[in-house]
Amino acid sequence: MRTEYCGQLRLSHVGQQVTLCGWVNRRRDLGSLIFIDMRDREGIVQVFFDPDRADALKLASELRNEFCIQVTGTVRARDEKNINRDMATGEIEVLASSLTIINRADVLPLDSNHVNTEEARLKYRYLDLRRPEMAQRLKTRAKITSLVRRFMDDHGFLDIETPMLTKATPEGARDYLVPSRVHKGKFYALPQSPQLFKQLLMMSGFDRYYQIVKCFRDEDLRADRQPEFTQIDVETSFMTAPQVREVMEALVRHLWLEVKGVDLGDFPVMTFAEAERRYGSDKPDLRNPMELTDVADLLKSVEFAVFAGPANDPKGRVAALRVPGGASLTRKQIDEYGNFVKIYGAKGLAYIKVNERAKGLEGINSPVAKFLNAEIIEAILDRTAAQDGDMIFFGADNKKIVADAMGALRLKVGKDLGLTDESKWAPLWVIDFPMFEDDGEGGLTAMHHPFTSPKDMTAAELKAAPENAVASAYDMVINGYEVGGGSVRIHNGDMQQTVFGILGINEEEQREKFGFLLDALKYGTPPHAGLAFGLDRLTMLLTGTDNIRDVIAFPKTTAAACLMTEAPSFANPTALAELSIQVVKKAENN
């Protein structure tokens, strides 16, 4: 039906007869001439109808936005004064000789001249996706997956599919369950990841595996989370953690070079402990120059319990954040930041405003200065490298609250004051995570997943001191986003059972949920390691949007609903009966 795409016409096509198919993006009626901007997935081209083709001109008078049409015409160069430098096709136009209206469009529920609500965009997603910026994002996503496949193929990885209907295993979130009609009362689970299957593929001898795969997690949603999402899933045998990172870093550098024309360079490597200490986050945004500075040792003897308490507590921390130029902040802004850190558990926000260091105590403004002597204040200013015009904020509490609150404050202030260089790319690897973390109920939970290997520990050493274990795990972070994470896996049955035991999974439950894995570990399992990237998040970064729904064709809302299809919906009672399922309705509160 077409000979060319609208958006691909150039001066090289001048004089050629072309047939185009697409939609009316805009129509301008000048009486004797009608101009339309005609759009397809590749872009927009100007088409005009003149009186010499009376039939086409008459039909063109009926055109409205989003009519689906076919046009045949001749490509012509525009006059110099009519060239549109803002359009890729702006040097040419098409003189139409014939027009076919394939399908007309009703009054549109979306307004192309105004910003539409996200609810409307999701309800009429098929119209929203016609917008050039949305089409470009999905084209970029397709380019990314194509680049990934070629790269992985060139590096000897095999694309192997793993099951969608599988067994429920604890991986940190709730499973989406699928009832079995054949096996009454039993359920499959949709995979949260192909984790165990890709490990089993390594045990099967496939050495290098990858898959671009859908994953499902029934968890509370955030702006950058979806109940179904796509991973670039990777697993290798006989490769160390640094070797895995090297190949995966090469992949990401390749993507940025091909999609953005940017060489990311070598990625720095930082331990989890260093990231938390310097940035209050295990996914630091290195475009932001501010760092946290520990000052607890300077405050142990002060008569100010807010500082002295955490300073003398082994589980406490007092950290300072120097804000260059922050002395210009108003009292209202400071109060707003004080309320902001309370979201993360902090009780408030102490500060020192540095007006003129040379004047000593008279050169600063601080509600806590009266609790600190001149020597301590000077030591704090020295350690934070404070200069005239700076602001120093303080966080004092247990280590987690200080890291969470001050890390979030660092990001917010960096953005608010323009300190974060948003023109840069700042990738890094974060390694050496704690293997376990407190579950809040006196037990331990895996920080990543229960199949991650400890670093340089035997099973006996791990069992004796699990709280000291460092995981052989690594995350890739770009501009403050965790885009991928992985680890060396446990390849020894005793170690795997030890980890299960630490996590409170008894032997009976181990056999019930992971018997197939424990059996496989008995038969010559190779050392193996892997990683998974979030394709949606990678695409979000590479297309410059901050909304993950912009890079998914048909996403869900934050309530895990599809406004277009109205899923989820009630099931047919007959279908439920065949599955031996009865829906129990909870009584509504009056």
Curated annotation (Swiss-Prot):
Gene3D superfamilies: Bira Bifunctional Protein, Domain 2, GAD-like domain, Nucleic acid-binding proteins. It is an enzyme of class 6 (ligase). Its EC number is 6.1.1.12. GO terms for molecular function: aspartate-tRNA ligase activity; ATP binding; nucleic acid binding. Residues 195-198 are annotated as: Aspartate. Keywords: Aminoacyl-tRNA synthetase, ATP-binding, Cytoplasm, Ligase, Nucleotide-binding, Protein biosynthesis. PROSITE patterns: AA_TRNA_LIGASE_II. It is found in: Cytoplasm. GO terms for cellular component: cytoplasm. ATP binds at residues 217-219, 226, 482, 534-537. The keyword Lipoprotein does not apply. It catalyses: tRNA(Asp) + L-aspartate + ATP = L-aspartyl-tRNA(Asp) + AMP + diphosphate. Catalyzes the attachment of L-aspartate to tRNA(Asp) in a two-step reaction: L-aspartate is first activated by ATP to form Asp-AMP and then transferred to the acceptor end of tRNA(Asp). HAMAP family: Asp_tRNA_synth_type1. Belongs to the class-II aminoacyl-tRNA synthetase family. Type 1 subfamily. Homodimer. This is Aspartate--tRNA ligase. It comes from Escherichia coli O7:K1 (strain IAI39 / ExPEC). The gene is aspS.
